[in-house]
Amino acid sequence: MKKGVLIALGLLLLWACRKEQQPEVPEPLLAVPQGFPSPEFPSDNELTPARFALGKRLFYDVVMSRDSSVSCASCHAPHLAFSDSVATSPGAGGLPGKRNAPTLANVAYQPYFTREGGVPTLEMQILVPIQEHNEFDFNILEIADRLKTDSVYSRMSQAAYGRDPDFYIITRSIACFERTLISGDSRYDQYQFQGKSEALTDSEKRGMDLFFSNKTNCSSCHSGFNFTTYAFENNGLYEVYPDPGRFRLTEDSTDLARFKVPTLRNVAVTSPYMHNGLLPSLAAVVEHYNSGGKNHPHKNPLIKPMGLTAQEKADLLAFLESLTDEKFNKNPKFK
């Protein structure tokens, strides 16, 4: 009897140990949330583990800048939804940046890039900070020369694209990694798409109703699954703008001081706000729109004084904070 019990206990312990040793199922490289379309990858840059790994390594490597002082992650920190906490991020040599670093969350869905929309693909956008004097202040061919002397990069480049490090693998691998930065599991998403009615508080629900109402017109610019129309708007931040915005690209006078509408996903962790980081907090942003902004001939006519009460402003802020995706901002896969 004792022998049988001992055998049974031994088998039970063996089964328990084997159960504990079962490897965890790795998280997929690309997870598309409910309510989101699948992002498109170019035919010459489809997602593979090798390309993801190479792009991620380059994203965090200061080898990308002339003096090896800054990387992509220096201005796009993962815990801040891949944005920065300062108005304008310092570049190589400590030179001040010209514009606020936007979040990279859901960058895969953007139809064009930079604040004025002058870059048509994510692969091409990778070149912008490299060449910009106030950012990396470098040349992509010189970066490639650096990478060719690194045996790890040479091996990873061959595994990812079947070629040695060059401009092609730099732009494509980083773009491939960035397309996986998809955020869509905020408490708002849990409420809206996952059927969790208790995911939002009463204040957040009131703020949501206000956000989508004609009283605020927030959703006229911040709509869709990514809370942006990607249109170019003047929001009355100044009467005279130091930055010409989209006019810099088109030289059309009606585009003066118009900038691409940003996503509001994770907006609570991406302060400061606006194209130049002028507004330090979400409360300041709400107050700006509540006041109707400054007078400018190209200001969107929907931006006008709202007359929000203190409670309505608090509810609106609460809703905006519910758009934070904590899992995304803490995901070790992206770090």
Which residue stretches match the model-derived regions?
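Short sequence/structural segments immediately N-terminal
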Residues: 109, 136-141
